[in-house]
Curated annotation (Swiss-Prot):
Gene Ontology molecular function terms on file: glutamate-5-semialdehyde dehydrogenase activity; NADP binding
Catalytic activity: L-glutamate 5-semialdehyde + phosphate + NADP(+) = L-glutamyl 5-phosphate + NADPH + H(+)
First-level EC class: oxidoreductase
Entries under CDD domains matching the protein: ALDH_F18-19_ProA-GPR
Signal peptide as annotated in the record: none
Family stated for the protein in its record: Belongs to the gamma-glutamyl phosphate reductase family.
GO terms under cellular component: cytoplasm
Biological process per Gene Ontology, one example term: L-proline biosynthetic process
Keyword annotations of the record: Amino-acid biosynthesis, Cytoplasm, NADP, Oxidoreductase, Proline biosynthesis
Full protein name: Gamma-glutamyl phosphate reductase
Pathway(s): Amino-acid biosynthesis; L-proline biosynthesis; L-glutamate 5-semialdehyde from L-glutamate: step 2/2
The UniProt record lists the keyword Amino-acid biosynthesis: yes
Length: 420
């Protein structure tokens, strides 16, 4: 049997396992997740040793290093997250809509699982736990394609998950970790009939790869080219704090600030807006007006003149660009040209300007006078998320349990037949 044939055979097993999840009651699903959380401490040494092998192959200066890193504190946090998912209300079998037709037919629209969800992701072994928990809670089976840089970690984690599933008398094929090789991704992306949807989580390059090569439906998540516009009516102290938070809180995540847009009438305030970033060694790529305003007031080694490509980059690190504009319209045009439609923000006190920005910006989350760091399922009160959808079909914004479900119509009659 070739590797391709072996993978397809395993995908068939996952599809079969997905049908066994549907009749499981809520107590069974929640009990599995809680036991998995309880078993993490005993498995920690094996998981951390596997993670150490992955880390040894990566330069600590690589922006992906922090995302790859697991430690005791992060494992404890993962266990807490698993318990939190278990405590969430089930999204399954909810009556979303119901009506009785004039002919007496009774219709109910009820929530159901998507089926088998394929996840492609990079450098984040915690995602392995997160995705399994969310997929199981929403009644879905999971096929994972992690990056080769997290191969050892992912194997150790999936081994633990499958052990817990097996120990509870359930089918361990409800989760499957594909080989780390790139060819496995191509098989997954074209597994029509076995995979119901693909969700890529990672860089824009990864998302583009999935969209280009997949014959399975794809929900795009993750990539964020995030802007914050400081308007001529913006409060300076508020702007300083928001910019600092949006850029430095967690620079490697998709809701981190990439480009600060500043109204030219506030160019003299630019040093106050960004000087606090110096303490975090944030590198700034500034257009000409911003560059000369910051020259001598921001460290020379952290300040460069921007080139065009800096305004379409998701930095995922302690880097950002600055663009000056002469009007709200110019700011909106810049965002429309470069945005990935993830998260965009305005800092302003003029309500007319705020309303125009909120109405005209096309993004999954649009903010006024707050940090884009809040684009997160838990922060939105939705519970854990599987990603941030940047498209408009099926789901948009944080994809929590409800977004991992579809629906079907249940139609009950008393012998009616259609005559027209």
């Amino acid at each position: 049997m070739t590797e391709h044939e072996a993978i397809v055979k395993q995908l068939q097993a996952v599809q079969n396992a997905s049908r066994k999840i549907v009749p499981l009651n809520e107590e069974t699903i929640n009990g599995l997740l809680v036991e998995l959380a309880d078993r993490i401490p005993a498995a920690a040494d094996a998981i951390l040793e596997a993670n150490r092998k992955d880390l040894e192959r990566m330069d600590p200066a690589d922006p992906r290093y922090d995302r790859l890193l697991l430690n005791e504190a992060r494992l404890n946090s993962i266990a807490t997250d698993l318990r939190n998912v278990a405590a969430l209300p089930s999204p399954l079998h909810r009556v979303l809509e119901e009506r009785t037709l004039p002919n007496g037919l009774e219709l109910k629209k009820v929530s159901v699982p998507l089926g088998v969800i394929g996840i492609i992701y990079e450098s984040r072994p915690n995602v392995t736990f997160d995705v399994f928990a969310l997929c199981l809670k929403s009644g879905n089976a999971t096929v994972l394609k992690g990056g080769s840089d997290a191969a050892y970690s992912n194997i150790a984690i999936v081994n633990l998950i499958q052990t817990v599933i097996r120990d509870r008398g359930l089918d361990p094929d409800m989760i499957y970790l594909l080989p780390a090789e790139r060819e496995a991704a191509h098989i997954l992306l074209n597994a029509v009939g076995y995979i119901d949807v693909i969700i890529p989580r990672g860089s824009q390059a990864l998302i583009d790869f999935a969209r280009k090569h997949s014959t399975v439906p794809v929900i795009e998540t993750g990539a964020g080219i995030v802007h914050t516009y400081f308007d001529q009516s913006g409060d300076l102290a508020m702007g300083r704090d928001i910019v600092f938070n949006a850029k430095t809180r967690r620079p490697s995540v998709c809701n981190a600030l990439d480009t600060l847009i500043v109204h030219e009438s506030r160019i003299d305030d630019l040093p106050v807006l960004v000087v606090p970033l110096e303490e975090k060694n944030v590198q700034i790529f500034a257009d000409e007006p911003a560059y000369y305003k910051l020259l001598g007031r921001y460290p020379d080694e952290l300040l460069e003149m921007a080139s065009p490509e800096h305004f379409g980059t998701e930095f995922l690190s302690l880097k950002m660009s600055i663009k000056t504009v002469g009007s709200l319209e110019e700011a909106l045009n810049h965002i429309a040209r470069h945005s990935s439609k993830h998260s965009e923000a305005i800092i302003a006190s003029d309500q007319t300007t705020i309303d125009a920005f909120m109405k005209q910006v096309d993004a999954a989350a649009v903010y006024a006078n707050t940090s884009t760091a809040f684009t997160d399922g838990a922060q939105f009160g939705l519970g854990a998320e599987i990603g941030i959808s940047t498209q408009k079909l099926h789901a948009r914004g944080p994809m929590a349990l409800k977004e991992l479900c579809s629906y079907k119509w249940l139609v009950t009659g008393q012998g009616q037949v259609r005559t027209a």
